[in-house]
């Protein structure tokens, strides 16, 4: 990966780009609020279903990855998937 391989934003971006058909439209914005970092994930409308997954399983897995990265970093991370 890159020299920032421990960065949750880079991890989330990398994993999401591997899931979607239009990786050039994936963007991740990190916002600090109330002692936690919220990552806002934006993808192409046609890829939204792939990112959410059946019954929300893929979205749940992405949130678990962020949670694990948060534990490792000693911080709280949250994920919002924007339409």
Summary of predicted features, one role per range:
Residues 52-56:
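Glycine-centered tight-turn and secondary-structure capping sites
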């Amino acid at each position: 990966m890159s020299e920032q391989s421990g960065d949750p934003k880079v991890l989330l971006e990398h994993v999401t780009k591997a899931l979607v058909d239009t990786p050039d439209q994936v963007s991740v914005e990190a916002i600090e609020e109330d002692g936690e970092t919220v990552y806002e994930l934006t993808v192409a409308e046609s890829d939204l279903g792939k990112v959410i997954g059946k019954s929300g399983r893929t979205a749940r897995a992405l949130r678990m990855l962020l949670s694990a990265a948060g534990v490792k970093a000693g911080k709280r991370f949250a994920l919002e998937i924007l339409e």
